[in-house]
Amino acid sequence: NEAEDGAWRVISGDRCIYIKHEGESCFDVSCDSTEFESYWHRYLDLDTSYRMIRGKVDRNRDPFLYESCMDEQGIRILRQNPFETLISFIISQNRNIPIIRRSIELLSSEAGTELVDTRGVTYYSFPEPWQIAAMSGEALGRCRLGYREPYVRRTAEGVLDGSIDLAKMTCADKSASDVSEAGTIKGLCQIYGVGPKVANCMSLFGLHHLDAFPIDVWVKRILAGKYPDGYPIESYRPYNGVYQQYMFAHYRKLSKGQA
């Protein structure tokens, strides 16, 4: 959420930070250097060279992707909490962004922990699996999840009892993971209420598999309009998910006449 002074408030789990753009490559953050280096540095994925990733795109061979990369240089794939991301994408199915945001806010206020940020503003942590599993039917109903309600509860229960092991799926520490992308998607689709689209979104944004390539209505339009002969997915491994985000953001701007 954007604050009155132009700073952005970012909540991750039980943490909250304000980030304000102060100039080219200069940002002001509302935490000390110890907290930033121990948590937010990794969360913002600052050790990944997105300049290197953009540099792999040839301007002449793929002008649209090159243009997208140049126009959307600020995009990063955050290293978000896997459980929080999975629940959020389960909630997102067949909904628009304002309704998704409201349901997540309601879930957090119903089951999360009430906290206060550095500016004295109250916020709620995203609930842990045990907090969601312990919710009454009435409390969960107040979150306006609709048919997704049992998906959310059963996912929380699965993480609690170990039948859903997100740690085994993550590639956040690639040196300790040999999980293939295809295997991850298959495993995610075995979770109650998770289909291919949610699985691909979860793989990219929750497990940091940078080659995952979620396809929604906007990406379908991009592929049909800009790549009628087929998108060269093999040429862009292992960063297809990053390129998808560049194209998605740039194409949305073009469609609104903002680029």
For the regions a protein language model found, what residue spans apply to each?
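HhH-family (HhH-GPD) DNA N-glycosylase catalytic core used in base-excision repair
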Residues: 1-259
